[in-house]
């Protein structure tokens, strides 16, 4: 390699200096992750070369034996990671090593918590793994040449991690990238063969590429041979190609960390080989925590796709539906072409068949997790439950299966935890109950004592309490479970079916008929603010309630539309009153039309507040309430 030419000094992307300092100081107890990250990057570089060489075999430059080499020099106090993968051009080095992938600097800084374990988990997720080199090194030199470029187009990138980096042109006969870490004072322990081998065994044994280290000689053989001898220190076989019986849990966990760029362990995994009409192997993982961008439209999602063990692409979204975008893993197919493109993957019988099978496999994995490890499933639900709730709308074929995985709060559990499965609810249904009842609202605290629940509590009927913003939208697609219909207890004219006796129904009709005059008076007082006024069959303790019209949008859907800037259709609630309540009896007896109007309006506003809605005229409500209080105290 010749001396540097055409040298430039450039500044890091804004905030990278701060980022480096934060990483160095917040991750000092997890120093060994630098090797995991750099080896993982080297493996990715080999995958990219394999893929590009499918179309341009000349990129292999006569050498298709890909490998990673890790070396050290005790005297020089250096550690070197060398690969013969795709390599970088000068422009690549400036853009890839001078800025942060995904423009993620600000997000990374925002998510650093001071908890070293959590912060270590963020490194790969934000595409900043290269910078972990500065945890142990006070200077990093990178020598690289992109495959296909002449030897004279090599690049030397160098930085001390202090806000600037130098880049220069060098001759580099071999393609690929060599990273030389100049260890800080006190980090000499990493310039040791035994230490490096242990770290590689711990973090990188699953890498499907040979990782080589120089063979060390001791005793009588201590004289080094003229040419270094290299030995493979990892298994160097793709984990998913090995029999399941030979793979330890720890190996699956380390492979997950590599493929998902996550330092935490997965909650579950499913490893399957399919043979028959289609031949493919899949290894799917359920992460232990949600990525920061799970609900971002352009977030990374999809499986790593291999064809006959040749890497094709990251983030192949075509093999799982969007609601399962949190699933990580690999799929290795023998039925797809090596030159498959994202466009080709958009449709076709092979892809469609694989997607259907992989979706079922992922849902089966979640069912098993829920059955065998309910505490882990509760963790999964906290992280990914809202994504899974998109399933009934997106995946009609698996709607019932997805519904069985959903969890809700209910009146059965006073903790408010989303722990009730629909199958559990069905198992607790009372005699004569043929419907599944639910109520939506902004929070458990807001709806747990809702007047809409009064008649259900009286009859001992469980009601699901749906408090996620997505829930009302979900229920517009999830209309039944186990052949039983869902009923919103706040919507329409409540009909409890067999839960009300014929005598009850007849009595309700008689009361409604006897109070038609009162209903007309209240409707006149409330005017166009209500669609209808009627006697309520929902109430036992409260004086009044607002019901949603059968075809109208509820509060959650209105808020969703408003938040997205869409027009919200005007709707009017139905005012229902409890004829047995003392306030309604007093209202019925009131002859003063002004007082009747004020009391009707106060009851209407209170019902709106109980439903979680805001008042159109809060000052008017306070004025009327104060007036009535003064009259009562006179």
From Swiss-Prot:
A GO biological process held by the record: response to heat
InterPro entries: HATPase_C_sf, Heat_shock_protein_90_CS, HSP90_C, Hsp90_fam, Hsp90_N, Ribosomal_Su5_D2-typ_SF
One GO CC term, this protein: cytosol
Domain of life the protein comes from: Bacteria
UniProt xrefs under Gene3D superfamilies: 3.30.230.80, 3.40.50.11260, Heat shock protein 90, C-terminal domain, Histidine kinase-like ATPase, C-terminal domain
The keyword Cytoplasm belongs to this UniProt entry's keyword annotation: yes
Keywords tagged on the record: ATP-binding, Chaperone, Cytoplasm, Nucleotide-binding, Stress response
A Pfam family this chain is assigned to: HATPase_c_3
SMART domains hit by this protein: HATPase_c
Region of interest called C, as start-end residue ranges on this chain: 560-634
Compartment(s) of residence: Cytoplasm
A, as annotated region: 1-342
CDD domains, A to Z: HATPase_Hsp90-like
Region (B): 343-559
One Gene Ontology molecular-function label: ATP binding
Principal subcellular localization: cytoplasm
Family named by the database record: Belongs to the heat shock protein 90 family.
Assembly description: Homodimer.
Primary role: Molecular chaperone. Has ATPase activity.
This protein's name: Chaperone protein HtpG
């Amino acid at each position: 390699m010749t001396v540097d030419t055409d040298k430039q000094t450039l500044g890091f992307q804004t905030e990278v200096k701060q980022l480096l300092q934060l990483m160095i100081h917040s991750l000092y107890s997890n120093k060994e992750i630098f090797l995991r990250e750099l080896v993982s990057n080297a493996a990715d570089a080999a995958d990219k070369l394999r893929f590009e060489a499918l179309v341009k075999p000349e990129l292999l430059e006569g050498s298709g034996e890909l490998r990673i080499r890790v070396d050290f020099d005790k005297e020089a106090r250096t550690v070197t990671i060398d690969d013969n993968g795709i390599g970088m051009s000068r422009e690549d080095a400036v853009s890839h090593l001078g800025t942060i992938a995904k423009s993620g600097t600000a997000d990374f800084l925002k998510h650093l918590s001071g908890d070293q374990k959590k912060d270590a988990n963020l490194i790969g997720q934000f595409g900043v793994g290269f910078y972990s080199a500065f945890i142990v090194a006070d200077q990093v030199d990178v020598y690289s040449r992109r495959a296909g470029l002449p030897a004279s187009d090599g690049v030397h990138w160098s930085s001390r991690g202090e806000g600037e980096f130098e880049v220069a042109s060098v001759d580099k006969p071999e393609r690929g990238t060599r990273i030389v870490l100049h260890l800080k004072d006190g980090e000499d322990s990493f310039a040791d063969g035994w230490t490096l081998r242990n770290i590689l065994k711990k973090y990188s044994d699953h890498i499907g590429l040979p990782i080589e280290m120089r063979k060390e000689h001791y005793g009588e053989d201590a004289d080094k041979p003229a040419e270094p001898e290299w030995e493979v220190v990892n298994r160097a076989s793709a984990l998913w190609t090995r029999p399941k019986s030979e793979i330890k849990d720890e190996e699956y966990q380390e492979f997950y960390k590599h493929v998902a760029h996550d330092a935490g362990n997965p909650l579950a995994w499913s490893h399957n080989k399919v043979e028959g009409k289609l031949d493919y192997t899949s290894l799917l993982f359920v992460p232990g925590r949600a990525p920061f961008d799970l609900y971002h439209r352009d977030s990374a999602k999809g499986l790593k796709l291999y064809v006959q063990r040749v890497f094709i692409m990251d983030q192949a979204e075509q093999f799982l539906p969007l609601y399962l975008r949190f699933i990580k893993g690999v799929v290795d197919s023998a039925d797809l072409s090596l030159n498959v493109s994202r466009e080709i993957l958009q449709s076709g019988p092979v892809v469609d068949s694989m997607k259907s099978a992989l979706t079922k496999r992922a849902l089966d994995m979640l069912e098993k997790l829920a059955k065998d490890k309910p505490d882990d499933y509760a963790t999964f639900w906290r992280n990914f439950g809202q994504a899974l709730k998109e399933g009934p709308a997106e995946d009609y074929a698996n709607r019932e299966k997805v519904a069985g995985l959903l969890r809700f709060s209910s009146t059965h559990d006073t903790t408010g935890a989303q722990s009730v499965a629909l199958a559990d609810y069905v198992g607790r249904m009372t005699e004569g109950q043929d419907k599944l009842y639910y109520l939506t609202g902004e929070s458990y605290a807001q709806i747990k004592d809702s007047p809409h629940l009064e008649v259900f509590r009286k009859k001992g009927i469980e009601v699901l309490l749906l408090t996620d913003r997505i829930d009302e939208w979900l229920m517009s697609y999830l209309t039944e479970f186990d052949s039983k219909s869902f009923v919103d207890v706040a919507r329409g004219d409540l009909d409890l079916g067999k839960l009300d006796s014929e005598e009850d129904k007849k009595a309700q009709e008689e009361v409604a008929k006897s109070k038609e005059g009162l209903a007309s008076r209240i409707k006149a007082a409330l005017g166009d603010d209500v669609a209808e006024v009627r006697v309520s069959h929902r109430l036992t303790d409260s004086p009044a309630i607002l019901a949603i019209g059968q075809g109208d949008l509820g509060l959650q859907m209105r808020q969703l539309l408003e938040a997205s800037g869409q027009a919200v259709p005007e709707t009017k609630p139905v005012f229902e009153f409890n004829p047995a309540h003392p306030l309604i009896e007093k209202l019925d007896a009131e002859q003063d039309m002004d007082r009747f109007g004020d009391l009707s309006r106060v009851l209407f506003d209170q019902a709106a507040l109980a439903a979680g809605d805001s008042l159109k005229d809060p000052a008017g409500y306070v004025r009327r309430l104060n007036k009535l209080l003064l009259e009562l105290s006179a």
